[in-house]
Amino acid sequence: MTHRQHTHHSSNIQEYNPDSGTAQTTKQKSGKVPGWVRILIASTLVVAWLAISGVGGPYFGKISQVSTNSSTDFLPSTAESTRVVQEQKDFYPSESVPATLVFTGGSGEGGTFTDEQKTYLDSLPTKFADNTEYFDGSSPVIYSQDGQAAEIVVPVKSSVAVKDGVKKARELTPEEHGLTRQITGPAGFAADLVVAFGGIDGILLLVALAVVFLILLIVYRSPILPFVVLFSSVAALSGAIFVIWHLANAGVVKINGQVQGILLILVVGAATDYALLYVARYREALTRHRSRFDATVEALKNSFEPILASGGTVIAGLLCLLFSSLASNQALGPVAATGIVLSMLASLTFLPAALALLGRAAFWPALPKLDSAQGYEHKLSTGLWARIADTVAAKPRRIWIGFALVLAIFAALSGTFHAEGVRQSDLILGASSARDGQSTLAKHFPGGSGSPANIILPADKLDETIALLDGDAGVASTAALAQDSPSGTVPVGRSAKNLPPAFASIKPTESNGRVMLQTTLTDAPDSTAAEETVKRLRQDLHGISSEVLVGGTTATTVDTLAAAEQDRATIIPIVLAVITVILMLLLRSVLAPLILLAVTVLSYLATLGVSALLFNHVLHLPGADPTVPLYGFVFLVALGIDYTIFLMTRVREETLSVGTREGMRRGLIITGGVITSAGVVLATTFAALAVIPLIFLVQLAFIVAFGVLLDAILVRAFLVPALVEDLGGRIWWPSRLR
């Protein structure tokens, strides 16, 4: 790199100029900032970040209080299932989430229930009716046709945490008289999700920090520096969580467990990456400056632009998620961007201040030595990265073509990555009580029991609608909401055959000229068959009236999948366009950004191909959520460009004095270790997401971890340098830089 000489006031210091290859002695300028002022500024910054950590730290345990895992909370207001949620408030006095209690274990002949067991079961609805704090009553006991199972649908009030509601339901229905009780339905699955996300505040963060600490120990071989770097990451995370908690509490953003987990990992990984870059520059500056503060000034000057540029690029990519129609994606953009901002601030304020106070002692026992004239030249000619750089420079075209072909082969498999959605029962890896309950329910009742499709329609279209539903093979039964009914509903259509006389005079409840039907589907609510039934019903019912709306659990899934697929088609081109413009401005080139971005996209597609092989043929996973490849793209492209910026800003810096090809060689040697370390840190932090037993996070953990390693170790070490070496000065076109 080219080094600007500094002059100093009171003492002579040695500075090494790599262009001349000599150590130089310069006089300090008069008017230099006094040492005590520098110490005061650094101390103030450290104390300020300690205060931020102290204030933000307690919010680690509070962030889950402002998160929600309800699917309908994140759908656009124009989605049909969202409109149903809004309109059904006219029929229900309060919002609720249904829990389906399934009872088996009959002691009678053939597994049927005895009279004693039926008496106990028939007494349970009264218990729910009396617990108005938790429940909006319940349905009567519904016995299966084979007499071997019974179900009770219990609406859990939205004012109650769903986990607490399910817990209360268990307390009210002890497994007496030889009965077995399971809880499923939307509330049951939501409670399982809450349990799965329970490790986010503690286990996930501890695992991530522990892994990063071990890597830092290996990288720095110092007992002091890893603690300083790690505190920088924790301080950034504390500040980010404090800001985001208040934004979520004010309703500015909506966050769920997935966003929460990604935030923790992203901030720890990004802050550590930026710290690695700064520490490398600081160590390098200490070899040229006796004064730790002069070294700090130089390190800040040399790391400010790449950290700001890389962080700004990641922020720009993340903010493209604001174009999403799903509120969960929209939330991830500003939430993660806030985390990146705090990561940059901590890396450019706290870390320089703390290291300035510690000086060379931070690197103990391997203290940086002052005169590096021989050391600098030695680094450029020996060591692993010098050998890699020489190999790339010797045969650049053969290397980049070979690596590109390998990536292209795996990229061709990206089309086999199945991202059409995952059944609700498959979201949780490992044990799921709600999934077990759903399986039991499906053996004795129609698959959609407990999770009906909610249909709201004009009252004058009721007969036509019922006739259409009766003729659909995907519909098991239909009931209309009726306030006068003891159960809250009255069977209609073919479901009304053999109706008891008490129900004969009951009419559906009408509100604003509309009525509401609850249609139980023959298939499980999270099955592909149920989704096809909802799509078919919507199309057919819209033929009766455009004012007919179909919602419910299955409809919410259909709308979410449609929105996610639309997001992929919209957001990916926007991210590519935004990052291309940023790279053009940063590198002052048109050709280089286009080539570098094409390489990054190829690396992403290769990662998807490898992921498809692993998920489909090794782990045999049931598929992936449509947002998985979108999140993977945003993170891998934005973070992959991060390493490109680290590398190419240094290459451009070296090119100004030694030309493009030698500048590429020097840039690779000097940044190779830092970029590889940063990639390993980021990959391991994202891999920590796999401790949360959710298929979405496990898949995202592998995609980002593998993709980052591929990008940092192979693409930035071989493919990009080989392309630059092959093209030479043409890479900077239309710039005249050669």
List each language-model region with its residue ranges:
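Membrane-embedded transmembrane helical bundles of large multi-pass transporters/channels
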Residues: 1-66, 134-135, 141, 157-419, ...
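Structured non-transmembrane domains adjacent to transmembrane bundles in polytopic membrane proteins
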Residues: 68, 77-100, 106-190, 416-623
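A short acidic, glycine-rich active-site loop
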Residues: 74-76, 409
